[in-house]
Amino acid sequence: MTLPSLRLKANAERRLRAGHLWVYSNEVDVAATPLNAFAAGDQAVLEMANGKPLGIVALSPNNLICGRLISRDTKHVLDKSLLVHRINIALSLRERLFDKPFYRLVYGDSDLLPGLVVDRFGDVLVVQLASAAMELRKDEVLAALLQVLKPAAVLWKNDSSARDAEGLERYVANAYGEVPDWVALEENGVRFEAPVLAGQKTGWFYDHRMNRARLAPYVQGKRVLDLFSYIGGWGIQAAAFGASEVMCVDASAFALDGVERNAALNGVAEKVACVEGDVFEALRELKAADERFDVVIADPPAFIKRKKDLKNGEAAYRRLNEQAMRLLSKDGILVSASCSMHLPENDLQDILIGSARHLDRNIQLLERGGQGPDHPVHLAIPETRYIKSLTCRLLPNG
């Protein structure tokens, strides 16, 4: 197969040669190789300004990120063979890390499969196709997954906003077999059922696995507040780890049904209470009622989805963490997390310092965490690092 060329401007290859995989539209020599000559999902040979090939790129010509490097070898295009090879490499890491088949199997760019995310729930796979190139080759993606893993069922969970930029429709559909509404998983020895069809993202957030494991020594015999609880990833584990009482707060009645379901599954239903409503309003009401907690977990959805949201997003993180601190006992633990890629950890740390000072409390950083190793960070692609988790101790100033 002979592929067309996509030529870069002079010196535009530096970031790519340093290891990054993304090509921006303003880096392309459109006089030599017009982007409008390509269709979304096409592949091309990426060339330096002097014509030297850099590899194979998959194209999204109408996007700012107009291409993603698939291979640095021009003989290796995105096809079933390459997918099988890369999925096997991804699988070998996860099987080394985990003794049970519950993990993120493929994490996009970090696993050298840009636009592809696969979460594994035993013999059920939930797949997100976030690029035109992957959508165009979804039959090959499915065939590769069936060959490598032989699952009982595969779900296309393609309802992410990331597809909008690619001009792709959102949909959720069975790709293979029959996917149940809820699937079983185990994390840190705690059992869960996740709503893969109707739930958020793939139905579960494996990225905080290691951070949730760190809860154990802090929650035994303690009263715990889990904010933005979803189906209880943090809260149910806190209860299973020995918390005396857990309150889960979420705006979604459906999510809180999941909390109750998972509490019952682990025999901790009598220790878990659910509060449905806006988290900020719930925080105000809890403060007005003079409620106090030994541990507060604040793991909100991304307040900063784009760079232009930075100012408002930082204000939201500040408001959330300060209100959470107001509910802590004198020697309390705050787990403050962020999944906003655009919020650096140092900025989250500064927010916590400022909030603690505003409340005249001392703050100690006990542990810092990131995403688990099934979400490996590609060190040349800082955008692949997004999870921050800071476990802090709040003390009176005196």
What are these regions (language model features)?
Residues 293-323:
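Mobile active-site "lid"/loop adjacent to the S-adenosyl-L-methionine
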Residues 319, 333-398:
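C-terminal catalytic and target-recognition region of SAM-dependent MTase-like enzymes
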Residues 231-244:
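Conserved SAM-binding loop of SAM-dependent methyltransferases across substrates and taxa
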Residues 245-250:
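Conserved SAM-binding motif I beta-strand of class I
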Residues 1-120:
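Non-catalytic accessory regions of SAM-dependent methyltransferases
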Residues 221-230:
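Conserved class I S-adenosyl-L-methionine
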Residues 254-297:
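S-adenosyl-L-methionine
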Residues 106-119, 135-205:
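Non-catalytic substrate-recognition/targeting regions of SAM-dependent transferases
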